[in-house]
Amino acid sequence: MRLLSFAFIFLLTFTSCAQSRKEKQAAAQTKPTSAPAPDSLAVATFAGGCFWCTEEAAEKLKGVYTVVSGYTGGSTKNPTYEQVSTGLTGHAEAVQISYDPKVVSYETLLEAFFAAHDPTTLNRQGPDEGTQYRSAIFYRTPQEKAQIDAYIKKLNAARAFQAPIVTEVAALKEFYPAEEEHQDFYRHNPNNPYMRAVSTPKVEKFKKKMEGKLKDE
């Protein structure tokens, strides 16, 4: 990733989302088993910067059964984390959410998505810079696209953010699950420097914004 300023160089050396694969593999663990899912689950795909944080935020929502970190939006088939981290594949770090629409609506997922990151910074989230960290929503149906467009229009009209929303809205082509060491990385590595400096503050802020719509902890 490209560093934002010389003042951040030392800090980002230890707190970048793009750490070495070897370091992450050492912390890999199996995703926990959730309660049996109903047959009528729907799926939604979002990109909001480093997927370690995005995954953790989504998993806290009531009605969400599974969240898978992965890559989408680009042209490279079966990309690796190292390839996506170059910013040359066109893929974004994303999450694929399986949810019960009887419990949590697509609009609530949109609300959570915009609460979990800054949708006004182009190709950047916090210290992470590059197209792989862009804000994006990948729709599956014309109805979803219309809902996304209307929601963004509403947020811009209400000036919910200090700058216009730059979130990409695109049709989902193919989602590639990330390597196992990236799944539930936040929960397995609470003392990781990046988690403590970047992800945990974002998740705590998200929890306050989405109070009443989260699972019991």
List the model feature ranges, each with a label:
Residues 5-15:
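Bacterial N-terminal signal peptides
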Residues 17-217:
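Flexible coil/turn and secondary-structure edge motifs
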